[in-house]
């Protein structure tokens, strides 16, 4: 048996071969979970109403303090719209609190207060793009459901974050106006503002984490009586059922939230490299790799996606033998292909719901920096005949957060 056949059989045996992720079936399941979530009948997709219309609201020249609490970084800026064009100024980026170790809600509020202190003289409006699950209120506050992406902030679940922030800032800004929006919804709004709104729109985040938001008819949001047309935050990373392989289960067991966000753990930048590492460990124990490669893998405690991108692009990764290179590159490419198939299935479900061309604003490092993944996804979109026009908004999350605060 030749080496490529051995690798294919191995990947099939441990459940990571791309052929095991059927785009048609997963798309059908995804659409069914969307319906369940919109009806309020439970299911793996929360389908959270945002109460924000899909068309950017009329905006004035009033500046807005825009915050972006992402999976890796926390950004803050002052955003002002002039003749409908967003201008982003005073942009600062720091590491997202709670990634290096657990912090308290009080610590997080103090951090935000410190970040925006100098900007309160410019604006009393704050728009927060929050990349974690929360229930929106009609007043555009957000009650936190849970965190993900390995971020830990104790005491935050169940809290109305805007109300808590107003309390923390009462002495500095008693007249504060606050709006909270999810990252995918902010990306959708930011894309519409920066690139133009021409039809059904969606926002896709595929970076440290995974999520998607899209415009939905009010009549379809059955769990919300008398709803108007609005953006729905899918919380797509929680989708299930999925064809989990052995490496997925091993990775899930060592995360901070085992059993949660299965799709995110199969696709996003925080986890894909770790799935590759688990697969390579299994390949080593199965005798597919040389002793030199086995030693290298055994010494690695983690493998970020930027490292798997690097290994895919060099001639002799790890052990250096031709067989090692074939095993390692085939496993990485196959896991990327599988991830792209899963995202394509999600997009197919949303496209079928839209019924016409979908204008998709994409944000996140996996799409823009992992060229192998991007090429695989764009190829699959074309092969499946999906009518998608994808676009990039330079500061979509900040722009979208500002628009939410002006709504």
Task: Go through each PLM region and give its residues.
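Glycine-rich phosphate-binding loop of actin/hexokinase-like ATP-binding domains
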Residues: 86, 150-154, 189-275
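Short, internal active-site loops enriched in acidic
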Residues: 131-136, 184-187, 365-368, 397
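ATP-binding/phosphotransfer module of carbohydrate and carboxylate kinases, centering on a glycine-rich
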Residues: 1-125, 170, 193-194, 238, ...
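Glycine-rich phosphate-binding loop and adjoining helix at the ATP-binding site
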Residues: 93-110, 134-202, 223-239, 374-375
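Short, acidic Gly/Pro/Ser/Thr-rich loop/turn segments
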Residues: 74, 133-137, 210-213, 241, ...
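Short glycine-aspartate micro-motif
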Residues: 62-68, 125-127, 177-179, 201-205, ...
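Glycine-rich, histidine-containing beta strand-loop boundary motifs that form or position
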Residues: 78-80, 129-130, 182, 205-207, ...
